[in-house]
Amino acid sequence: SGQMYEPEDSGKVMWYREDTKGQILEEGINEAGSMSEWVSAATAYSNYNVNMVPFYIYYSMFGFQRVGDLCWLAGDIQAKGFLIGGTAGRTTLNGEGLQHQDGHSLILANTIPNCLSYDPTYAYEMAVIVHEGMRRMYENQEGVFYYITAMNENYTHPAMPEGSEEGIIKGLYKLKSGGKHKVKAQLIGSGTILREVEAAAEMLEKDWNVSANVWSATSVNELVREGMDVDRYNRLHPTAEKKRSYISQCMDEQDGVVVASTDYMRLYAEQLRPWIKQRYVVLGTDGFGRSDTRERLRSFFEVDRYHVVVATLSALADEGTIKYDVVAKAIKQYKIDADATNPVKV
């Protein structure tokens, strides 16, 4: 029947509200039951001729990791709806160690052909993705469902850059343009690590005379699927004009090395390598989770702003654009322990 009482925080801007026209099922620690309820609502369009729009919100580690077979079932029977992986990312649900810290839900999501998965950072990205999902599932009646990660960090959400909707849906758009230094770089980030990438771009500009464009990768998986589709077309149409993948169109004309950083295993962003012609470096969170602050975890997994800067400078040195002494200086300046154990081996 919905919310029949006035909550304690009703006087605040972000107060808790349940609309009587909707339905909220609070199942507690019951992933299998919750996913089954979501599947039931997500298939109501075919079983009862009623279009329902279910959102299942959960800690991201407790989705595909716990109920992967039910997720595969959802794809098989063409369920429609949204799975929202909350507090997503290896370094984000930070207080409870390896059990809760998700570094691979987006990789698992990509195993289901009709699951579209996204890792947004800003509210406008989430809004565009949900709007597009509603259009595809309920206006176009496509047999797909969505997995979208969500965070709970406090940070400023900017206005949506003009003309970015298409890139948000396709999986990549330029968020910020770099300055006018001769040495260039392209920094790709997603989810909670995008903000570290933005900070790294400012540091590169100010401290190392490197101008970096910042790209928000809302969906590496969608970029990969489109890239493979283009490759397949070109392979089977040898005499036709060659198509170019969207990621190639974004990156081919850009100068400098490309560095991608996410809160997930390196395998996630590594998928883009076939379509990036520049020197390409990937940072990720391989290994088990740890119990610590988000800031310290991002340092531990080597995906924070300082490691993004060092990775960029190292790639520039590898291609001969700058000297290795510059990389060594940055490592010393940021107090990075170059002899620390690889996180995946700890």
Model-derived features: where do they sit?
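Thiamine diphosphate
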Residues: 1-111, 125-131, 198, 269-270, ...
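Short catalytic-loop micro-motif centered on adjacent basic/acidic residues
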Residues: 25-26, 55-57, 116-119, 187-188
